Amino acid sequence: MPFVMAIDQGTTSSRAILFRGDISIAASAQQEFPQHFPASGWVEHEPEDIWASTLATCRAAMEKAGATAADIAAIGITNQRETVVVWDAASGKAIHRAIVWQDRRTAEVCTRMKADGYEPMITDKTGLIIDPYFSGTKVAWLLDNVPGARARAERGELKFGTIDCWLLWRLTGGRVHATDATNASRTLLFNIHTGDWDDELLQLLRVPRSMLPEVKDSSAHFGDSAYELFGAPIAIRGIAGDQQAATIGQACFSPGMIKSTYGTGCFALLITGATPVKSHNKLLTTIAYQLGGKRTYALEGSIFVAGSAVQWLRDGLGIIKHASETGPLADKSDSMQSVYLVPAFVGLGAPYWNPRVRGALFGMTRNTGPAELAHAALESVCYQTYDLWAAMRADWSGADAAPPVLRVDGGMAASDWTMQRLADLLDAPVDRPVIQETTALGAAYLAGLSAGVFPEPQKFADNWRLDHRFRPAMSQATRERKLAGWGRAVKGLLASDEGEG
């Protein structure tokens, strides 16, 4: 039985996982790489670190499984979205560090674009809003701030890509410059209705079309790896951005199904089907996947700080040594205290979209200690998810206007404390699957589908298995009181920004 190898290139580490044909995991490898913070609100990665860690983990996973290139039917790639690399087309060398999705350096540019009235047009075409989060203004910044970059781009000497595109270029030895529709849909340059790069958007951001990759289906033959990498070529047959890949790995194929992934940030996607639904509550309209030339759309809510709030407890405050300690510590908190953390460390994402505000704690007393801070950090993830859930309920008219169950995955989904509190605040069941490597599984599925290893989507969905269902156990009065307190905390933070303005 052949393997399918999934490359899961994330914000803090690169992983490779070998899946068997029955979707069980044969082997995996992971390698972290450095983060760079050259200025307040700036986040960068070295593109060579991303490539080196990806190649190393692929080789390590193959070695653990005793697999050769001949044993692998296909490679699937999933990646941190929106992160931008620009490189020299001839040498393959990046002209600057990658600008990461969390980076906020283009906030002033985005503010000016909004003031100039461009947002309605951009939202209509892309399903997105004007925000530093997305790739377009990052590319423009590189062209304007790296000496000679704009002239080189206009001469056709530079290539642009999200991380999937960069890895595909390196895997194929510089032979293939392509991406898939899910990654393209996150750039602020792609028209999600026509399925092509948009000339009006390219002109607005002054990005030459010659820089841009070909856009393909999420499940397709993108190219073959260079012979010298693995001892023989391996076909690369699937690509999707990490959140779309997780949606596929969670078998969310029917309209109304929703998943939420908890990694560095939190990202909820609700499948809306073949027709894009325009949000009236500051959610994003995005492409969930594209198969056989047909696009399936989703509503998405993006939260910038989820697991990184726990990292802050560990690395910033030093009150825990391991993330697994957070839930037991939160259990010890004083129930008489109502401490709220609004973790706007890099601004607020959906549904507020304010890149200027910064994090704040509300409700602290003289007795507030580590347990209360741990409690507030974990609850902040649940409150932010509630905000997305409420917005989705308001926007989605199918399935009685409310997704009945939330499927969860990612590192924080392993925290029973957090998942139970999430069910309590949503007043809805929260389902955690047996296979929690859903992002990698989604990438593997796309590749395996193209290679003929995995079945069509609905048959694949039959393989989804429940590990645990968390049911709401909080009284309505307590839920309403806690949500009202969160609402006041967010309102207070946003008011402080207005006061400074």
Curated annotation (Swiss-Prot):
Cellular component GO terms held in the UniProt record: cytosol
SUPFAM superfamilies, per database record: Actin-like ATPase domain (SSF53067)
Annotated ADP binding sites: T11, R15, T264, G307, G411
GO molecular function, one term: glycerol kinase activity
Enzyme Commission code(s) on record: 2.7.1.30
Regulation acting on activity, per entry: Inhibited by fructose 1,6-bisphosphate (FBP).
Keyword annotations from UniProtKB, A to Z: ATP-binding, Glycerol metabolism, Kinase, Nucleotide-binding, Transferase
Record InterPro entries: ATPase_NBD, Carb_kinase_FGGY, Carb_kinase_FGGY_CS, FGGY_C, FGGY_N, Glycerol_kin
One record GO biological process: glycerol metabolic process
Pathway where it operates: Polyol metabolism; glycerol degradation via glycerol kinase pathway; sn-glycerol 3-phosphate from glycerol: step 1/1
Catalytic activity line of the entry: glycerol + ATP = sn-glycerol 3-phosphate + ADP + H(+)
Residues that coordinate or bind ATP: T11, T12, S13, T264, G307, Q311, G411
CDD domains in alphabetical order: FGGY_EcGK_like (cd07786)
Keyword Protein biosynthesis part of the UniProt annotation: no
PROSITE patterns per record: FGGY_KINASES_1 (PS00933), FGGY_KINASES_2 (PS00445)
Ligand binding (glycerol): R81, E82, Y133, D242, Q243
Residues given in the record as sn-glycerol 3-phosphate binding sites: T11, R81, E82, Y133, D242
Entry similarity comment: Belongs to the FGGY kinase family.
Functional note: Key enzyme in the regulation of glycerol uptake and metabolism. Catalyzes the phosphorylation of glycerol to yield sn-glycerol 3-phosphate.
Name of the protein described by the UniProt record: Glycerol kinase
Organism: Rhodopseudomonas palustris (strain HaA2)
Taxonomic lineage: Bacteria, Pseudomonadati, Pseudomonadota, Alphaproteobacteria, Hyphomicrobiales
